[in-house]
A protein has these predicted regions:
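Active-site-proximal helix-loop elements at catalytic-domain edges
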Residues: 1-26
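M16/MPP (pitrilysin/insulinase) zinc-metallopeptidase core fold and M16-derived inactive scaffolds
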Residues: 18-95
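Basic polyanion-binding and macromolecular-assembly surfaces
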Residues: 28, 112-113
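M16/insulysin-pitrilysin zinc metalloprotease superfamily fold
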Residues: 88-112
Length: 113
């Protein structure tokens, strides 16, 4: 993340995210608040949002792959520096690459001034 970017979402960003990608709220998510990503979307790290955007894009692009479950993890490596590790599985490398690029473009458009 750029030094100027926020590290955590807020209510306004959460509303914009859910307006653009309503299915994010229903993603399963291991967290301390509840069973879905919607429980934490208004106060979670931007890398965590990125993880779920990538997963969501892959689910939509791979709708014909009915036996695949997409999972991911996110951890800060250095929050002050904006460095995080985000890992997601994938079924198709080109679809995954597109999902990563689209998620980055979307987040940059939302948070980079």
């Amino acid at each position: 993340l750029s030094p100027a970017c926020p590290r955590v979402t807020d209510d306004a960003l959460a509303r914009r995210l859910l307006a653009a990608v309503p299915t994010l709220a229903r993603h399963s998510c291991v967290n301390d608040v509840g069973p879905t990503f919607g429980c934490v979307i208004a106060s979670t790290s931007l890398p965590h949002v990125f993880e779920h955007l990538v997963i969501d894009a892959q689910v939509r692009a791979c709708a014909s792959f009915t036996d695949i479950t997409f999972v991911g993890t996110t951890e800060w490596l250095d929050e002050r520096a904006g460095l995080a590790r985000v890992e997601v599985n994938f079924a198709d490398d080109l679809i995954a690459l597109r999902a990563v690029n689209d998620a980055l473009a979307y987040l940059n458009g939302e948070v980079v001034a």
